[in-house]
Structures are given as C-alpha cells and as structure tokens.
C-alpha cells in the first residue's frame, strides 16, 4: 500500500513538474518539493535535491527537443547562463548573512500571474523581429538580466525558470518557443549544480522516490516539449498559461496545507 501511495504521489508531482518544464521552462522544484514534503513527509532539503535532479534530465530532453526544432538560442543562452550561475552563488551567500525569510510563496504567485499573462496577452513576437537586435546590445542585456535573475534565485532559492521566461519574453523580446528552449537549456545546468550541491551536503536520497521522480518528470517533459514545438504560437500561449495557472493554484493550495 505504501509503495502504491509513493508511486502515485511521485507520478502526479512529476506530471505537474514535467508539463511545467516542457511548456514553460519552469523548475520542477516548485511542484515536486511541496508534494514530497506534504505527502511523503520528506526532509525539505532532500525533497529539493530530488526535485532538482528530476529537473536535470527533463530540462535536457526538453532543450534537445527545442534545439531540434530550431527553437534554442545556444550562444546567447551560454552568456546568460554564466551570469546566472555566478550570481546565484553571490545571492545565496548574501541570503546566508541576513535573517531567513521564506520567499518561496513569491515565486509561486509569480507563476500564477505569468500564466494569466500568457492567456490574456499572448507573446506573439516572431523570430524575424527577434533578429532585429544587434549582437552587442543583446549580449549586454543578457548579462544584466542574468545577474538579476541569478541574484534573486540565490537569495530566494526559487523561481529561476519563471523569471527567465518572463525576462526573455517581456524584456528581451524573445519569441515564446525560443524563450522556453533557451530557458530549459540554462535550467539543465543550474539544476545540475543545485542537485549535486544538495546531495553533497545532505547525503544520499531515497533512491526509489528519486528514480520515480526522474523517470516520470522526464516522460512528461518530453510529451510537453514535443507538443509545444508543434503548436501554433497562440495555442502554445494558451496551453502554457493554463499549465502555469493550474500549477500556481495547486502549489498555493499545498503551501496552505503545510
């Protein structure tokens, strides 16, 4: 009975996480962690470690799918990733020096609002319009935004994927598919860094839960990424919006339960 319960919890947690990753480049940690903590009474630090390692393969497979469909900006993604990773470390160092405030709720609420934005005001930028920005200007924008995202993520410990998507589409004028593709590409490496450091500090995870989460998240992320790359922009905006709104509401519900 306990095994069946574990399988069900990990399946639904990973389904939400995989769909969020494949459609919107959202971090699996936002969905998987609260469910593992609430239902399986797992240590929060370990739950985040498991969620981040589920994120690594799911993001990598999504990034590969977006890349195959020419919806990934690798060169600029690498520039942004360097500044995000550097300042995540700075942010978490600063956070360790100030009294801890739980800011996780902020990133969940942002997920919900971002979902509503995609439904009401779809991102209809084209790839042609994206190419209109000079390479130097784009590089500077990416470094500045990367510093901001990295610092906030390190400080709060959450919200990376959503902030990247918001900034890539709203500030940097990326077309939606390319924004998600670039976001999951960066998330692959940020999640890997996070997962390794969690397990080095917190010890080995519950291997059954870890394995189930990794496999299920990978499966759902692949399904979502394939659909997202075939969908028309308007349909994709709506689908992404609905996934984000539902996940935002569900996670807020779990946060109230705990």
Predicted features along the sequence, with ranges:
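Juxtamembrane transmembrane-helix boundary motif
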Residues: 1-19, 31-39, 44, 65-151, ...
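Hydrophobic, membrane-facing alpha-helical anchors
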Residues: 1-6, 53-64, 159-168
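Transmembrane helix-bundle signature of multi-pass membrane transporters/permeases
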Residues: 18, 48-56, 180-191, 244
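Transmembrane helix boundary and interhelical junction motifs in multipass membrane proteins
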Residues: 23-32, 157-167
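Membrane-interface alpha-helices at helix entry/exit sites of multi-pass transporters
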Residues: 42-50, 75-76, 173-184
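A small-residue-rich subset of transmembrane alpha-helices
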Residues: 54, 182-198, 208-221
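Short, structured loop/turn "capping" segments at alpha-beta junctions
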Residues: 126-127, 158-163, 174-178
């Amino acid at each position: 009975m306990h095994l069946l319960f574990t399988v069900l919890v990990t399946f639904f947690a990973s389904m939400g996480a995989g769909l969020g990753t494949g459609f919107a480049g959202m971090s699996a940690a936002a969905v998987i962690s609260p469910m593992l903590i609430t239902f399986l009474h797992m240590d929060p630090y370990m739950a985040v470690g498991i969620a981040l390692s589920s994120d690594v393969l799911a993001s990598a497979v999504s990034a590969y799918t977006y890349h195959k469909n020419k919806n990934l900006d690798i060169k600029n993604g690498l520039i942004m990733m360097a500044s995000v990773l550097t300042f995540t470390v700075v942010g978490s160092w600063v956070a360790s020096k100030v009294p801890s405030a739980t800011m996780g709720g902020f990133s969940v609420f942002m997920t919900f609002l971002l979902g509503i934005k995609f439904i009401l005001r779809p991102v209809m930028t084209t790839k042609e319009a994206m190419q209109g920005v000079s390479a130097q200007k784009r590089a500077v924008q990416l470094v500045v935004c990367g510093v901001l995202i990295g610092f906030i993520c390190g400080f709060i410990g959450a919200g990376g994927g959503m902030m990247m998507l918001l900034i890539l589409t709203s500030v940097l004028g990326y077309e939606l598919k390319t924004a998600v593709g670039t976001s999951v590409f960066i998330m692959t490496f940020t999640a890997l860094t996070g997962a390794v450091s969690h397990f080095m500090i917190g010890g080995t995870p519950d291997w059954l839960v870890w394995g189930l989460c990794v496999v299920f998240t990978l499966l759902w992320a692949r399904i979502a990424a394939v659909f997202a790359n075939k969908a028309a922009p308007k349909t994709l905006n709506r689908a992404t919006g609905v996934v984000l709104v539902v996940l935002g509401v569900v996670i807020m519900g779990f946060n109230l339960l705990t």
